[in-house]
Structures are given as C-alpha cells and as structure tokens.
Regions:
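Catalytic core of tubulin tyrosine ligase-like
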Residues: 160
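Short, solvent-exposed loop/turn segments at secondary-structure boundaries
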Residues: 100, 164-166
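Short, low-complexity N-terminal intrinsically disordered segments enriched in polar/charged residues
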Residues: 2-6, 10-75, 79-83
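Short solvent-exposed loop/turn micro-motifs enriched in small/polar/acidic residues
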Residues: 59-60, 133-135, 170
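Hydrophobic pocket/interface hotspot
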Residues: 65, 77, 112, 152, ...
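Short hydrophobic/aromatic patches at helix-to-coil boundaries
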Residues: 206-209
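A solvent-exposed, acidic/Ser-Thr-rich amphipathic alpha-helical stretch
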Residues: 83-153
Length: 209
C-alpha cells in the first residue's frame, strides 16, 4: 500500500505521527503569515475637509516644485522653502524627527545652498555628463488646515537618466506648507519617504528628489 493510500486509510495525522516516531523529526505547522514578516509601516494619510480652491492651489504648488527640479532651476526651487524650511529624507519610515537621526538628506536652507553650489560648480565633473529627471506627482491629499499652515500628502515617481543608466525612485511626500505675507505658500518641511531608500546604488543620490 502506498503512503498516500495509508494516509487516506488511517488519516494524515496518524501517518505524520508514525513518520515522526521513526525518524525523530518534528513537524512544524506552516506559518502562512510569514515567519519573519513585520507589520507594515506604510503611512496612511488623514483627509481634511478642504475647499476645491485650496486643493487645486496645493496641487499646482507641488506640480511646480517638481517641474523646477526637472528643469534644474535650483535657485527657484530652494526659494520655495521658508527661511527655516527643512528638506528631509529619512532612512526609515518610522522616524519622526530629522534631528539626531541618520538620514539620507537632512538639509536646512544653508545646507541647500551648499548642495546647490556643488551642483552648479564648473568643476563638478559628476554633473558634466548629460543627465535629467522626470517627476510624476499624484494622489495629493490635504491632511490638515490650521490657520495659514497646511499639511499635505502625495505620491511620486522619479525617473533619472544619467548617460545610459536609468534609475527609478518612488515614495511619498509629506509637506508642511506655510502661507507667507504675500499670500503664497512656502515649505516649512518637506519629508520624502523613499520606497527604495535602502536599496543599493552604484552612486549616491546627488540632487533632491
């Protein structure tokens, strides 16, 4: 009689116990949830009740910011930040503060100016090769409105072409926008959570995403 036939006749449990007693092996129930699985840290945004006009204003601001990066208009892009504005790319999504934590980027206006100087320096040979980016921004959500401050969430995809090499970056933006005296928004905080932030790269990320 085959093992399958024995299993049908005696029941699978009996056969397993018999095999265990003969071999000394111990069966382990399958873990369908994944033995090493961790709970998801994917951020889920809140949704505030905002006017259609404010929604469109926020969307257009984010689209323009992305367009300035693609055009390499660094001065105009950094000009979107408040004097105390911060650009932050954390290493891990569970990080809550850019101070005292390892980060991919953690730059105030002064450090942005330093990076811009490196990107535009005539002897920056890493920038001599033809390269460019293309941003796609969507799923824009207004999370909260508090006076002149608006918190937003959005998703992005970036394609970077450098010579013959294409790299893709994806993730989410979280902006804290503050309306200035002239009525326009300035960025108090831009948080960039990279989906592939811990991936291995042949060379470092040199410009803002």
């Amino acid at each position: 009689m085959s093992t399958n036939e024995v299993g049908k006749a005696l029941g699978t449990g009996v056969v397993i116990e018999a095999v265990e007693s003969m071999t000394g092996a111990e069966s382990i129930a399958p873990d369908h949830m994944g033995r090493g699985a961790r709970p998801s840290t994917q951020y889920v945004p809140d949704v505030a009740h905002a006017s259609h006009a404010l929604q469109r204003e926020v969307e257009n601001f984010l689209y323009r910011q992305a367009a300035l990066l693609d055009a390499k208009r660094w001065q105009d892009w950094t000009g979107l930040f408040a004097d105390d504005g911060v650009y932050w790319v954390p290493v891990a999504p569970e990080q809550t503060d850019w101070l005292g934590e390892p980060s991919i980027f953690a730059e105030d206006r002064l450090l942005m100016e330093v990076r811009m100087g490196r990107l535009t320096h005539p002897n920056a040979w890493s920038q001599a090769a033809a390269w460019g980016t293309n941003h796609l921004v969507g799923n824009v959500v207004i999370e909260a409105v508090d006076g002149d401050t608006v918190r937003t969430y959005s998703r992005f995809q970036v394609m970077e072409l450098r010579r013959d090499t294409v790299r893709h970056f994806g993730g989410s933006y979280r902006h804290t926008l503050r309306r200035g005296a002239d009525g326009s928004f300035r960025i108090a905080l831009q948080r960039v959570d990279l989906m592939n932030g811990q991936a291995a790269y042949d060379y470092v990320i040199q410009a803002w995403l």
